[in-house]
């Protein structure tokens, strides 16, 4: 099956969320902070969470870690399950980019949390970078929301990826969820992670 087949065939499930972090290498960063918030609050227990992982070993590791949560599943990047999830999840949360073939459906909500504060040249601010930059530009342009920690990041992303005036979504200068997770962690939370 191809992505185009799944795109045409599958309906969007309003209670499903897909999370992707750096091509599925880990469960970290702002998508993970959002996931933890949603799984810990009763109001969101109806949601099903699907995480993208990069390999069978990563898949098995996280399945074991989250086996107590029946509403959490994992898909290996570029698998049929991944293609299906890309076309059926209502909410898509990514800290980088989805593949170049990805096309957001009209009734999907794409939240890009990006993964840092730009203190270097990026995007089209780097000479001769159009080919390397085009998928990132496209991902930003199709996102509904870009989460930004501050005005500096908003300005740099907007300029480096030439988003204005064509970007139809919204920059949310609300800080990165990952920082809330860090600041609000208790000593017990930290000890559990480190053990």
Predicted regions and their residues:
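Structured loop/turn residues at beta-strand edges in well-structured enzyme cores
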Residues: 12, 87, 105, 141, ...
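Glycine/Thr-rich phosphate-binding loops of Rossmann-like dinucleotide-binding domains
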Residues: 27, 101-102, 120-121, 156, ...
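Hydrophobic/aromatic residues located in beta-strands of well-ordered beta-sheets
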Residues: 49-51, 110, 146, 171
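Tryptophan-centric aromatic hotspots in well-structured domains and transmembrane helices
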Residues: 51-54, 110-114, 161, 165
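Helix N-cap/beta->alpha junction signal
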Residues: 53-55, 96, 149-152
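A nucleotide-sugar donor-handling region in carbohydrate enzymes
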Residues: 123, 135-195
């Amino acid at each position: 099956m191809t992505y185009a087949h799944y795109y045409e065939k599958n309906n969007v499930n309003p209670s499903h969320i897909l999370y992707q972090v750096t091509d599925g290498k880990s469960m970290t960063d702002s998508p993970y902070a959002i996931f933890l918030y949603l799984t810990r609050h009763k109001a969101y227990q109806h949601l099903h969470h699907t995480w993208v992982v990069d390999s069978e070993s990563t898949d098995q590791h996280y399945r074991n870690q989250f086996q107590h949560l029946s509403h959490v599943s994992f898909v290996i990047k570029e698998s049929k399950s991944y293609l299906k999830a890309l076309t059926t999840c209502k909410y898509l949360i990514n800290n980088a980019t989805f593949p170049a073939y990805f096309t957001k459906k009209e009734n999907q909500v794409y939240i890009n949390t990006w993964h840092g504060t730009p203190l270097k040249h990026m995007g089209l601010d780097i000479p001769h970078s159009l080919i390397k930059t085009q998928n990132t530009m496209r991902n930003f342009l199709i996102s509904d929301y870009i989460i930004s920690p501050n005005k500096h990041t908003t300005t740099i992303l907007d300029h480096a990826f030439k988003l204005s005036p064509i970007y139809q979504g919204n920059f949310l200068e609300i800080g990165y969820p990952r920082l809330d997770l860090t600041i609000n962690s208790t000593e017990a939370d930290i000890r559990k992670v480190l053990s």
